[in-house]
Design a protein with these regions (language model features):
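Catalytic phosphate/metal-binding cores of nucleic-acid and nucleotide-processing enzymes, i.e., regions
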Residues: 1-93
Length: 93
């Protein structure tokens, strides 16, 4: 499954739950997550999406570590099942 399909699925699932999944690019900072997801319960997540055979670049790994150090919500998701699990968990909290 291609990353583009997984990304479309994320956007639709978040929309179905009343949230928004903003496409995010930062020319000055490589490695930033693909999407910033705002959920109706007030949570904001930085989401990196990958095809099942995809790998994080070194810059993406650094971004993930930075988010953890700043207590930000971050996830790298490789499948529709992971998207469903993470979003259901996040909306429930």
């Amino acid at each position: 499954m291609k990353e583009k399909i997984i990304e479309k699925y994320l956007v639709q699932r978040v929309k179905d739950l009343g949230g928004r999944a903003y496409k995010f690019t930062s020319p000055a900072h490589r490695g930033v997550a693909d999407r910033v997801v705002c959920l109706p319960n007030g949570q904001t997540w930085f989401i990196e999406l990958k095809a099942p055979d995809g790998r994080l670049s070194e810059m993406q790994k650094i971004f993930a570590s930075d988010m953890a150090l700043m207590n930000q919500k971050y996830a790298c998701l490789w499948s529709k099942e992971q998207i469903d699990g993470r979003i259901i968990e996040a909306v429930s909290n």
